[in-house]
């Protein structure tokens, strides 16, 4: 019975896959978003976004209950999503959620606080 139980345990882990996304520094993130096919996504609050954001970034607040619903409506599955938050914490949560649904995600690991590029208000 023990070998069978171990086999079942092992097989259950095979079905679980961690959500994969790339976490990059600000310089690499800037290079990534130079590609005009990459979608820029700000996952902060509306008030944070209004204070300044990366140009052409969409806003979907990851703390809202309808985050995934809005993401599925606005983000095409065939595009790379480059996302960020203020410090890198919320963006990791958003990156995991999106990657789990099959999106290709690149996340700014140190957040907007480390951004030295152009800012739009």
What is the predicted role of each segment?
Residues 84:
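Short, surface-exposed ligand- or partner-binding patches at beta-edge/loop junctions that are enriched
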Residues 5-13:
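Bacterial N-terminal signal peptides
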Residues 2-3, 15-32, 38, 47-80, ...:
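Rhodanese-like catalytic fold shared by cysteine-dependent sulfurtransferases
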Residues 40-42:
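Structural scaffold elements adjacent to functional motifs in cytosolic proteins
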Residues 10-11, 45-47:
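Intrinsically disordered, low-complexity boundary segments flanking structured domains
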């Amino acid at each position: 019975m023990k070998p069978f139980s171990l086999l079942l345990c092992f097989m259950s882990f095979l079905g679980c896959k961690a959500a994969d996304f790339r976490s990059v520094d600000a310089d690499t993130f800037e290079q990534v978003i130079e590609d005009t096919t990459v979608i820029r996504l700000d996952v902060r609050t509306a008030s944070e976004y209004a204070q300044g954001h990366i140009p052409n970034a969409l806003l979907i607040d990851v703390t809202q209950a309808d985050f995934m619903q809005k993401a599925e409506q606005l983000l095409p599955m065939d595009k790379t999503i480059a996302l960020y938050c203020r410090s890198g914490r919320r963006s990791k949560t958003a990156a995991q959620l999106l990657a789990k649904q099959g999106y290709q995600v690149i996340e700014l690991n140190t957040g907007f606080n480390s951004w030295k590029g152009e800012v739009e208000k």
